């Protein structure tokens, strides 16, 4: 059986990237929370 997770860089960026996060209010909230938490990486 084929495994379910077949990583693709393009999809990873398009779905979880910084610009994608900035494009919606909830995405901006994600970034805000990660900044407050002190994450080194804010997004993929």
UniProtKB/Swiss-Prot annotation:
Keyword presence, Zinc: no
Record keywords: Ribonucleoprotein, Ribosomal protein
GO molecular function: structural constituent of ribosome
Domain of life from the UniProt record: Bacteria
Region called Disordered, residue ranges: 1-44
Basic residues composition bias: residue spans: 1-16, 30-44
Coiled coil: none
Biological-process GO terms, alphabetical: translation
InterPro entries: Ribosomal_bL34 (IPR000271), Ribosomal_bL34_CS (IPR020939)
Pfam families: Ribosomal_L34
Annotated Gene Ontology cellular component terms: ribonucleoprotein complex; ribosome
Record flagged with keyword Membrane: no
Family: Belongs to the bacterial ribosomal protein bL34 family.
Protein name: Large ribosomal subunit protein bL34
Source species of the chain: Desulfitobacterium hafniense (strain Y51)
């Amino acid at each position: 059986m084929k495994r379910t997770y077949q990583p693709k860089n393009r999809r990873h960026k398009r779905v979880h990237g910084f610009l994608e996060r900035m494009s919606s209010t909830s995405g901006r909230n994600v970034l805000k929370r990660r900044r407050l938490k002190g994450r080194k990486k804010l997004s993929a």
